[in-house]
Amino acid sequence: MNSSRAVSLSTDDVAGTAKVSARGVIDWFAPVVPDSRVAIFRTICYLFVILDMHLIVRDPISLSRHPELYRPLMLERLFQLPPPSLPLTMALYVILLFGCLVAAANRCPKTAGYLVAASFTWWTAIGISYGKVDHDHLALIVALWVLPTVGSIPGRWDSRVRSAQAGWALKCVQIAVVSTYFLSAVTKIRSGGWSLTSWPESSILMWAVVRRPNGLGQFLMPYPELLHLMQWFAFTAELCSLVVLWLRGRALLLAALFWLSFHVFTVAVLYIHFAPTLICWLAFAPLERFRPWLNGVIADWRQRTGRRAARQTVPIFRDQAVDGSG
């Protein structure tokens, strides 16, 4: 009797522990966050895509004039996408431009969102099918695919609703942001014959500085030991980047500032930016606080402007000026 009761209690404990563990995993992958955070993040992402297609991946239209240089990526081969042509790239450009404007206003979030996601994925694939394959767009493309899953948000920026659906979408973007760094480290290990020391012990940074003698980099060329140390630092930071996914509060803020500084430094040394990834770091931020802060700034400005206008002197014909405040 006692033995069967003990077995029953043990089974209940195991089931309870499993349920708690499953709930913890679900809460981590799909935390309940304000929907307004997604609404604001959507606006930022879609407006950035317009900038991206004009300033970063801006050459698919011109590249489509040279079909002999086209080397399709695995994605394009897998879906048997047609080779780029001038009409095709122009159509993608128009679809992206109007689709982003609609989606940035949080209108037709699923229709416009998926249309932009598919078009920009194809646009970016075309842009990197003629040369070097960059990895700075990973998080942005993931964001474009998961943001439409949240659907319509009543009140948009001013929404007071909280949902796990919004949390899941943002968590996917966060994982993609961190994966950009971690997978970069894995690629370095793989390219070095699966050796942890091959890439950081190489002279790749010196080669990059010699190849791009710009900005701060040209002043670092006489110091190969420092460049060598910087390689180890960057490689170690990329390997440890997964920790960011479990940080909260001030620790998360410090991590975000660290990676922001990291990218500022790469711009200063090599003129290489990671703007699409940096935009997606906003998936970690409490963006729902932006609207109240903006409303407060506008209210303060209006109040100060109103006081100034009230204190201005008002000239009266054939009389001395009087104070408009009373």
Task: Annotate each predicted stretch with a short phrase.
Residues 2-326:
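Alpha-helical membrane-anchoring segments
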